[in-house]
Structures are given as C-alpha cells and as structure tokens.
Curated annotation (Swiss-Prot):
Its EC number is 3.6.1.41. This is Bis(5'-nucleosyl)-tetraphosphatase, symmetrical. Keywords: Hydrolase. It comes from Coxiella burnetii (strain Dugway 5J108-111). CDD domains: MPP_ApaH (cd07422). Belongs to the Ap4A hydrolase family. GO terms for molecular function: bis(5'-nucleosyl)-tetraphosphatase (symmetrical) activity.
Length: 291
C-alpha cells in the first residue's frame, strides 16, 4: 500500500471513519509502516490514520514516509522533536553535519520545500473529541489541564505558520527555561512549551523538566517522576496517546495513557492502536539502524 495507490483512489469522506489507528514513532521506517498497514487491513476510504510524531530520522526512508503521509486524506499528525530538527536543517538554520542523522534524502529532494511547508503546518497536539483522545509526542506537563495544553500548543502552531517561523526555529534548541512561569514571554515561553510537548519524559509536580534523563521509569532523578504519574485521569477525562519514550516499550503505568514508541528505529517494532477498541498491533523492525 503506497502513496500512489492512495492517490489513485477516490478521496474518502473520513468525517465518520470506521476505525482510527494511531501509530507510534515511525522515524523513517517506511517498510515497517507499510507492513503495519497491511496487518491492520487499513482502508484509506474507511479508516483514518494518526501519528504521534517523530515521523523521520534514524530509519532509512524518511523521504518515503513524508511523501506517503502527505498523500493521506486528513491524517491526525503531531510533530515530534526529530520533525522539528528536520525543519531546522531543511531551512538551512543549522549545518547539516551538526549531528548524525539520516535525513539526507529529504534535504536533497526536489519537493523538499513542499514537504517542509506541509510539515510545519502540523500541530503539536491533536484533540479528537469524538474519541475522547489527545495525541501528543512526548506528553502533557502536570501544571496544565487539557484545555490549557491545547491553547499552549496553538502558540507553537502560530509561530510555525507565521511570517517569523525562521527566527522561531533558529532559536528553538535548548533546555532552558526548564520551569514554567505564566509570565514567560517570547522565545523562552515558546521553547518551554515545545520542550514539554516534544522532549519531556521526567518532570516534577510543578512541571519542572528534566531533559537529560532518558531511561526507564524507575531511573527517575530525585523528586522527578514520569510526567504521566502526575496527571489526574479523572480530571483529564481523555485518553492521552504519546510516543517519544522507547524505553517504556509501549507500557505506561498510568490509566488512560497509551505509550506507542516501541523502538522500531532501534531494531524493535512499530506499533499501532485502534482508538475505539484499544487493540494494539505491531510488526518487527526489518530495517537496519543507519546511524
């Protein structure tokens, strides 16, 4: 099932899809993505797809992944930290050899600018009211409720889609500020929001981010916990679907939180969840890690 097959079909009315499948961190693993779609018997005229970010990098076929996703009818996509990194590289805001990556094919593609334009119009959060679900790459910090999280994510979307998106991206990287304050302004405010939604794993009860630790939940530094252990499921009243944290191996200890990063780019597997039934589907990695 490739992009050409979907483009050749009559566009579907997906206002009321049969099933909505959310897929974990693809990270350029196009072959595994296609195998997963075969496994779930995805029908683009009846089903809807969603992705929790990190669409690209580390795997071997980021260009094919982007072209395929762009061809879909109304996919539910949120950005991850690797997707933001691609935007920074793609717009020439950082030397291509600053870090190891597998994005060279995207950066040299004739449709690069078209793909970047499409990518930067994707949000950091998707709220699906009909399914009582929120999609985010890393997580939701504890000091914000669902409505506040959505509003803060819209601040990033406004910056990415606005006339000064290059200045925003150029100054995006960094770990500070690591603590939220309501009076944060400018790039500091945007950087904290972006880090919370795309890089967070551990934080404290007030949303102070620890962006250095990447291990399992029992490896949290003093006073820090996995972000989902601070949230109140009864107050949220939604399912939170996220990726980013491969060390969780798709397991979250908190109710109504669904971890989908199962480390495909690291040689493990790619996972999807049916949002209606909560059934999971996985395929093993077939692509050797390229970095």
């Amino acid at each position: 099932m490739d992009a050409r097959a979907i483009n050749s079909r009559e566009k579907a009315d997906l206002k009321y899809p049969r099933n909505t499948y959310i897929i974990g961190d693809v990270q350029g693993c196009y072959r595994e993505l296609q195998e997963l779609l075969e496994l779930i018997q995805f029908d683009s005229t009846k089903d809807r797809l969603g992705f929790v970010g990190d669409l690209v990098n580390r795997g071997p076929n980021s260009l094919e992944v982007l072209r395929f996703l762009k061809s879909l009818s109304s996919p539910l996509i949120v950005l991850g930290n690797h997707d933001l990194y691609l935007l920074i590289l793609g717009y020439g805001l950082m030397p291509e050899d600053s870090y190891e990556h597998t994005l060279h094919a995207v950066l040299q593609a004739p449709d690069k600018l078209e793909l970047l334009e499409w990518l930067r119009h994707c949000p950091l959060i998707r709220y699906e009211k009909s399914l009582s679900a929120v999609l985010v790459h890393a997580g939701l910090p504890p000091q914000w409720n669902i409505k506040e999280s959505i509003l803060h994510a819209e601040e990033i979307s406004t910056a990415l889609k606005g006339p000064h998106y290059l200045a925003f991206l150029k100054n995006l990287f960094g770990n500070e500020p690591s603590q939220w304050k309501d009076d944060l302004e400018g790039q500091d405010r945007l950087r904290y929001i972006c880090n919370a939604f795309t890089r967070m794993r551990f934080c404290d009860a007030k949303g102070h981010l620890d962006l250095e630790s990447e291990g399992k939940t029992n490896q949290a530094p003093s006073r820090f916990r996995p972000w989902f252990e601070w949230r109140n499921p009864q107050e949220d009243n939604v399912d939170i679907v996220f990726g980013h944290w491969a060390a969780l191996n798709g397991q979250s200890s908190a109710p109504h939180t669904h971890a989908l990063d199962t480390g495909c780019a690291w040689g493990y597997k790619l996972t999807a969840i049916n949002l209606k039934t909560k059934e999971r589907f996985s395929v093993p990695c077939q692509s050797a890690l390229r970095m």
